[in-house]
């Protein structure tokens, strides 16, 4: 169980990092990133990546408003 939790923490860190890169305008090939993941991890990773992208875009919009 602990190994699985560590894996999810690592995947979450990677999803956040790639979302930050995307928000900075750097190219991110999400298919290449997730290419070797099994379906369960790929689905989870892509959902987290999309969530972080959304959060970062909302934060950027708030910065531009002020």
UniProtKB/Swiss-Prot annotation:
InterPro entries: GlgS, GlgS_sf
Protein name per its UniProtKB record: Surface composition regulator
Pfam families per record: GlgS (PF08971)
Gene Ontology biological-process annotations: negative regulation of bacterial-type flagellum-dependent cell motility; negative regulation of single-species biofilm formation
Gene3D superfamilies associated with the record: Glycogen synthesis protein GlgS
Function: Major determinant of cell surface composition. Negatively regulates motility, adhesion and synthesis of biofilm exopolysaccharides.
Organism for this UniProt entry: Shigella flexneri
Similarity-based family: Belongs to the GlgS family.
